[in-house]
Amino acid sequence: MRRSTAIVIAVLALIMLPLTLPLTTSTAEAQPADGVIHVSASAAQGGDGSADKPYATIAEALKDAQAGATIEVGDGTYREGELSVDKSVTIRAAQGAAPVLSGAEVPTSWSASGGSEGSGSAGTWSTSADMVRFCTVCTTNADPSAEGMAAHPEQVFVDGKPLTQVASRAEVTDSTFYVDDNDPITMKEPGNNRAGFNVKPHRGASYVIGVDPSQHTVEVAQHSRALSLLSDNITLSGLTVEKYSPVQEWNYTDPEIGGNTGGVMVFASGTGLNVTGNTFRYSGAGSALGIANAHDATVSDNHLVDNGGVGMGINRSSNVTVENNLWSGNNSKGFITKDCGAYCAMSDTKVTHSENVRYAYNTVDYSQSGTDHSELSSWTNNRQVAIWFDEGVLNSSVLASHFVNVPTAVFVEVSKGNTVASNLIEGAGVGIQVAGSESTRVWNNTVTHALTSISVYEDERSNGCNARGSDGSCTLTESWSAEHGLTWDTVDTSIYNNILSSEQVPTDGDTWRYSAMVQVTGAKNADG
């Protein structure tokens, strides 16, 4: 959980530069008489956006919307992707409706091999080899092989339930799938994706499953990005956004969709952003929701659940309110969370290079995970963080939130002037962790059933420098922290009026440090 310069969230701002967008809005036509553009998944083609003749797709509505328009989305599933919004519009669910924006398609052409479902003999079914090819080496880890199958962002769902991806056709069962690709995207330098990628055609993969698709509804994720919200005063409200497969890296340029391959399922920037009452789930490898260069934004009453990697990221933003949201089941792919150096990012929410972020009244709940994360056996391998302030988060707060059975609840790292107050943490590896941060206030929290309730330690880095040469000169400056004069030293930490109870009891073989309710550890500024 160190040197996070290369993390997926920290590069969110880059999407503003190379983004290639296949859908662009055009000069608007006349708006419907009631001022609302209507969309219905069951509508016939050729609609005009009126209540009587709604559009059949969100893309059509976006194309014709004027700045200030409201797009009202009716019930149904909208299988669309790589949508770009560059005007101030509201996209909302119609009253009483539960629309789903899905990146998955339902293949209609399958070929069978072997036995049949339920016959007792193994059988597989394959799509044609014209499905979308996703990058399986585009991880924040420079060596994708270290991540195993987590590096593969592909997704298949049978009757709404996700299958587990496997590495060979021989491993396919009724609960797994395999992607057969004879010409996959590769790295220019084996074992180091930082050297770049060998770009391949957008399509060319075949999906293999172990159930008869004629007896089930089979969905295959075929889009990387759902939405890019790129203007001021955009509202997204009441939608379920699901089953997209963004990769973690931002710098793979697909020949058809360009930079939309990477980073996030939904990207949002601008002033006056409002994201409320949505569900973001089943994002393949990249973050479900990524916010960058946003100001005066509100993210409230959303569910970010069951995503392959990070739930939400915030970067280079200010005055962002994050309230009354729920996170659960994220990092379902199982990305590495321990000893991962520069690419550590796995969290429910990661905030970087930002100020005045208010995270309040939220819930992060892993009570259904089947693992007691206060046990040493969990902490040994799982360091996922519920809410993580990193690399220059300024004057922000984590308030009145509830964390249930999480590896790490709150982590404040190399930041300044932040408050962690009035939170309830029930079960954790570490409840509250502060590292290399100035003027952190830890007040009025309750931590129960944790391996360590509060941990405060000195980060070995200093003055916004991630690495130094043998002569002591900085060779890797973190520009935001350096510009804001951060020392990256743990000073002026205030721990006041907290309740710490029911600490996890050490067992045979545990070392002394795991029995402490509160740890305070010093270090030299020797690394960076």
Where are these regions (language model features)?
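Extracellular polysaccharide-degrading/modifying enzymes targeting complex plant/algal/animal polysaccharides
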Residues: 36-38, 42-268, 273-274, 473, ...
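Asp/Glu-centered strand-loop micro-motifs enriched in Gly/Pro and often flanked by an aromatic residue
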Residues: 60-63, 281, 419
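Internal hydrophobic scaffold segments of catalytic domains
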Residues: 83-107, 152, 161-165, 301, ...
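Glycine- and acidic/polar-rich repeat regions and solenoidal domains
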Residues: 246-268, 285-292, 296-297, 306-528
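Surface-exposed extracellular loop regions of Gram-negative outer-membrane beta-barrel proteins
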Residues: 273-281
